[in-house]
């Protein structure tokens, strides 16, 4: 739901729990 997780995912993975990679940033549901 929230657009930003405060993390980028140029490598394709997110370290923040509950976040997924919508390149090039991590997004939350």
UniProtKB/Swiss-Prot annotation:
**What the record says about its domains?**
The presence of a 'disulfide through disulfide knot' structurally defines this protein as a knottin.
| Keyword annotations of the record | Disulfide bond, Knottin, Plant defense
Is the Cell wall biogenesis/degradation keyword given for this protein? no
- Which Cys-Cys disulphide bridges does the record give? 5-19, 9-21, 14-26
In its UniProt entry, what is this protein called?
Cyclotide psyleio D
Q: What is the lineage of its organism?
A: Eukaryota, Viridiplantae, Streptophyta, Embryophyta, Tracheophyta
Protein's job? Probably participates in a plant defense mechanism.
Read off the Pfam families from this record.
Cyclotide
For the cross-link Cyclopeptide (Gly-Asp), what are the residue positions? 1-29
Q: What post-translational modification does the entry describe?
A: This is a cyclic peptide.
Q: Does the keyword Transport apply?
A: no
GO BP term, example: defense response
């Amino acid at each position: 739901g929230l657009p930003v997780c405060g993390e980028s995912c140029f490598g394709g993975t997110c370290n923040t729990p509950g976040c997924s990679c919508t390149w090039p940033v991590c997004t939350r549901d």
